[in-house]
């Protein structure tokens, strides 16, 4: 409340980006805490934990990049890397393989479950950066709306992890409002 009352209206998108990032990292940490807790071994909880970590990590690092571009800490120019689509696709496939390993614990990767979790966190953080960096500063409001939707989905998934109905509903509302805002922002683009 204090931060939002002290920030100028022209800096509100940066604040929203930070709030989205905090929501993403909070959801990610809930997922990690519940995964490390040995009593959370039900199949549904493992699916929710994996989804929470995946979306929470992407939201956190993507929101930090969006904040940096809007506040001009990072250049607002799009950062295009050579072979970016191949790198992003490969990272996404590897993240999904890690999610399946977390859920089913097949042992095919020859890694401990905790190692798989922390590798997944690293990949999701990298994905958030690589998905947000190629977008120019002028399109950041659209990205922030999408990340708002992601933070709501991560919060809702965290609600499933800890069996909290209020968090499930609140996250779903934030996710839905972010999705509506994203579609209306994207519709204004030529």
Give the residues covered by each predicted segment.
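Transmembrane helix-loop junctions at the membrane interface of multipass transporters and ion channels
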Residues: 33-41, 142, 150-169
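Conserved small/polar residues in nucleotide/adenosyl-binding loops
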Residues: 182-190
